[in-house]
Regions:
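Acidic (Asp/Glu)-rich catalytic clusters
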Residues: 58-61, 125-133, 164-167
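Glycine/proline-rich, positively charged
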Residues: 78, 149-222
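Acidic/histidine-rich helix-loop elements
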Residues: 71-89
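N-terminal secretory signal peptides
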Residues: 1-10
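Conserved, mostly hydrophobic/aromatic
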Residues: 57, 69, 109, 124, ...
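C-terminal segment of N-terminal export signals and the immediately downstream linker at the start
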Residues: 30-68, 81
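Glycine-rich, proline-tolerant flexible connector loops at the mouths of alpha/beta enzymes
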Residues: 111-127, 185
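N-terminal export leaders
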Residues: 9-30
């Protein structure tokens, strides 16, 4: 696909290019710990571990949990949210939260280079790397919101860093983050089209380093 064609993508063409695998990001569906005595992971014995609902991804046949775990607000050592606090992430608690999620059938974890002030991918990767790679699905994003990250080089560097932080050699679901935000189509083109980044990601998908390529959307549906 040539960049010249990309500049004229409409919504239908865009969805076709992504192969119908446009993904919706999960909310943070399991709570962080309120305090050391009232931890989310103490509920392990109270919740059935065999009643998760799954959906089959028609493109890959992945059996994905209907409930996903959003990793935007990992807890800190001071029991705050790492989204708002610069305190260290409480990795021990993150590990236990992930353990509870997996024990109860959750296998889809959604993160981003932007979450937790840039620390979510690393904490998520540490927690998940304790499990066999085929036991979970990682969704992360190309979160190149700032104009300083719009160049091809900066965007690709962000993409490669996600592999390092997550400790993986492929990403299950890679999302173009927050399309529709900012200055609409003009900003979208600057982030993904004019710089050739979408073409690069399509090649990465072809090579198997991205299993599903999609986007998250926070704008007006019209």
């Amino acid at each position: 696909m040539k960049n010249e064609h990309n500049k004229n993508l409409d919504r239908r063409d865009f969805l076709k290019v992504l192969g119908g695998a446009a993904a919706v990001t999960s909310a943070t569906l399991l709570p962080g710990c309120k305090n050391k005595q009232e931890s989310a992971y103490t509920a392990t014995t109270d919740i059935p571990t065999d009643q998760m609902t799954y959906r089959i991804n028609p493109s890959t046949q992945d059996r994905v949990s209907l409930l996903g775990y959003g990793c935007m607000r990992w807890p800190t050592v001071s029991n705050n949210s790492a989204r708002d606090s610069n305190d260290d992430i409480d990795q021990e608690t993150v590990n236990k939260l992930v353990d509870v999620a997996i024990a109860h059938g959750v296998n889809y974890f959604d993160t981003s280079p932007a979450y937790c002030k840039g620390r979510s991918e690393r904490a998520t990767g540490i927690a998940l790397n304790r499990y066999p790679r085929d036991k979970y699905f990682i969704a992360t994003k190309l979160s190149n919101f700032a104009p300083s990250t719009w160049s091809r080089e900066a965007s690709i560097a962000m993409y490669h860093n996600s592999f390092k932080e997550l400790q993986v050699n492929y990403i299950d679901y890679l999302l173009l983050h927050g399309v529709g935000m900012g200055n609409g189509l003009q900003e979208f083109n600057a982030r993904y089209i004019d710089n050739g980044v979408l073409d690069f990601l399509l090649a990465e998908r072809q090579a198997g380093r991205i299993r599903n390529l999609g986007f998250s959307y926070h704008g007006d549906i019209k």
